[in-house]
A protein has these predicted regions:
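Beta-turn initiation residues at beta-strand->coil junctions
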Residues: 141-142, 179-183, 190, 199, ...
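Acidic glycine-/aspartate-rich tracts in secreted/extracellular proteins
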Residues: 6-10, 23-28, 49-51, 103-105, ...
Length: 215
């Protein structure tokens, strides 16, 4: 496997839009014939992560609309995320806020009966997907960003996120928890279904509870 993230970024502004694979040692001359009619055709697989929402490690062009909210356009894929703050309370221990989000990557979906592309920060979901023959979990946060979790080799009940946010997912007997690096815990119901080749995604379950590090 090769990480071509930086190379792919250069494709946007550069003239070269390809990948060259070369041996570490080369001879002065080399000749080899490959027939176009061979049964084993070469192929190149490019994997990319969903960049559908708002994340601190991505770059956006922000535009305020006053009390209506703020629009953010991703400089990576042109996706529009519009955030409208509904309410916010400091609280004695754990602050609470609710925000409406419109995500143009979800413009064809009305999952929560709020209009196409809309959700609130409380509509956080979890489901399973079948990817390269392995089952992974996908956590969708309040603005629509998808975070993928792969199973740990040393602990079959724990999964680590692939977005670099240091999130840990653990499958328990009664529920599933996601813990961040500050020891805040999100609790979800068990995802009982298993994805298959014919149905590679399971139904989504909604978050049940959020608990801070001190309980």
């Amino acid at each position: 496997e090769f990480d071509v993230t930086n190379l792919a970024r250069k494709w946007y502004l550069g003239d070269n839009h390809g990948v060259q694979l070369s041996a570490p040692k080369s001879e002065s001359s080399f000749s080899q014939l490959h027939s176009s009619e061979t049964a084993n055709q070469p192929y190149f697989v490019l994997e990319y992560a969903s960049l559908a929402g708002l994340e601190s490690y991505l770059t956006y062009d922000h535009q305020s609309a006053g009390l209506a909210g703020t629009g953010s356009v991703s400089l990576v894929n042109g996706n529009l995320i519009f955030a409208h703050a509904d309410t916010a309370m400091n609280g004695n221990r754990l602050p609470v806020s609710i925000t409406h989000y419109y995500n143009s990557c979800d413009s064809d979906k009305d999952e929560f009966g709020m209009g196409y592309g809309w959700r609130t920060s409380l509509h956080q979901t979890l489901h399973k997907v079948l990817y390269n023959g392995e089952v992974e979990f996908v956590y969708t946060d309040g603005d629509g960003t998808e975070h993928f979790f792969k199973k740990n080799e040393d602990d079959q009940k724990k999964y680590s996120d692939q977005s670099g946010l240091s999130l840990t997912l653990e499958v328990g007997d009664e529920n599933i928890t996601i813990t961040d690096k500050g020891d805040n815990v999100m609790t979800f119901p068990l995802v009982s279904d298993t994805p298959t080749e014919d149905a590679p995604e399971t139904a989504k379950v909604l978050i049940q509870k959020i608990q801070d590090a001190v309980g």
